[in-house]
């Protein structure tokens, strides 16, 4: 089994960075998202922001169920499932006709990332053999994928702006094709058989540990977070920053459009933001 696991680990580590580059987020899409929803789907700017609020709410609700699902189904299956949800999300965006369909799409998106945020990194962690440089290898592979995503996202953002002028559906369809490619790549991952995890699973079954007791442990964890001033501050800070980021990314495009900025220039500005994010991701890898 150990020899078989070595082959699986090599396979997973070989494709992870490329997979992460294509699946970290939606390439081609975000540069034209606001324009597509407001101009093509006739959704108001306020509703575009509101749908992001629904996404945040769904993510909070799904965190505990997603953890349980990953634990039950395994990291590989959940990674594949998350990417399939991503394909469904973009399909709903293309065919959406009203705000209610957008809310449904945001729920599907929350299903996607609540699973992927857990399963992707856990899959990589399990794929790296136990050694003194395990953390370094993880940071290198994860950082390389994230950095390359931001750079390729910058290039595709520019392309998306010019393609949007030709036909607004073209960049969204390209985003869907990239997501389908990432889904196909996710089938190449292998589940790592871990004897220790199997033994722990057997012990948990013998001791009749149920989902209810698991949720109780999480509640105890939340109580600890609430009592900790530092953790409360960290959660508040993260919430404010994330909310500000959503507002800025949405209203940036709205303001640029209101002052008569061309779609191509809006895409170029998004590309510059993407390049800055890539530099930041590279710096994070260096300092880590």
What are these regions (language model features)?
Residues 1-10, 189-234:
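Juxtamembrane intracellular "pre-TM" segments in multi-pass secondary transporters
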Residues 2-61, 228-273:
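Helix-loop boundary and gating motifs at the non-cytosolic
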Residues 28, 56-64, 150-154, 158, ...:
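Residue-level signature of mid-helix packing/kink "hotspots" within the transmembrane helices
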Residues 36-40, 93-95, 150-175, 258-259, ...:
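Transmembrane alpha-helix termini and helix-breaking/packing motifs in multi-pass membrane transporters
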Residues 61-75, 164, 279-288:
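Helix-to-loop junctions at the C-terminal end of transmembrane segments
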Residues 84-98, 102-103:
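C-terminal ends and interior cores of transmembrane alpha-helices
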Residues 107-150:
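Cytoplasmic helix-loop-helix junction between adjacent transmembrane helices
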Residues 170-188:
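Symmetry-related core transmembrane helices of the 12-TM Major Facilitator Superfamily/SLC fold
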